Amino acid sequence: LAVCVSLIGAANIPPQHLNLYQFKEMIRYTIPCEKTWLEYTDYGCYCGYGGSGTPVDALDRCCYVHDNCYGDAEKKHKCNPKMQLYSYKLTKRTIICYGAAGTCERIVCDCDRTAALCFGNSEYIERHKNIDTKRYCR
């Protein structure tokens, strides 16, 4: 399984988008080279904005778990996951999160790390891209 590594810097990314940029980079590191991270933004019932119903497959479950992880970070730890910056390293086909355990930096990084690794280990089923969520996600 080939892995793509991005060398793009974050210097010109506005601060309000840096966490999503970091998550995107994690995803790009773990998914097959023939896929782009954008293919994961409207997949199943949970990959992308919002989510409802039962996940359609293992990949969609990765997004469901990620959504819940962000929800827990907000409710239990008073974090703002979409704005939270964190330190991490992409190395040897895995992702290492830095920061003290229990801090928002570490909690959010762990959410993104877990999801990205899950994406890399889950089959991408083309028919679950852009599904009719009103019909399949109840």
Curated annotation (Swiss-Prot):
MF GO annotations: calcium ion binding; calcium-dependent phospholipase A2 activity; phospholipid binding; toxin activity
Pfam families: Phospholip_A2_1 (PF00068)
Matching InterPro entries: PLipase_A2, PLipase_A2_Asp_AS, PLipase_A2_dom, PLipase_A2_dom_sf, PLipase_A2_His_AS
Alphabetized Gene3D superfamilies for the sequence: Phospholipase A2 domain
Top-tier EC class: hydrolase
Keywords associated with the record: Calcium, Disulfide bond, Hydrolase, Lipid degradation, Lipid metabolism, Metal-binding, Neurotoxin, Presynaptic neurotoxin, Secreted, Signal, Toxin
One Gene Ontology cellular component: extracellular region
Compartments where found: Secreted
Keyword Signal: yes
Propiece residue ranges: 11-18
Swiss-Prot/TrEMBL GO biological process terms: arachidonate secretion; lipid catabolic process; phospholipid metabolic process
PANTHER family: PHOSPHOLIPASE A2, PHOSPHOLIPASE A2 FAMILY MEMBER
Complex formation: Heterodimer; disulfide-linked. The A chains have phospholipase A2 activity and the B chains show homology with the basic protease inhibitors.
Family listed: Belongs to the phospholipase A2 family. Group I subfamily. D49 sub-subfamily.
UniProt name for this protein: Basic phospholipase A2 beta-bungarotoxin A-AL3 chain
Source species of the chain: Bungarus multicinctus (Many-banded krait)
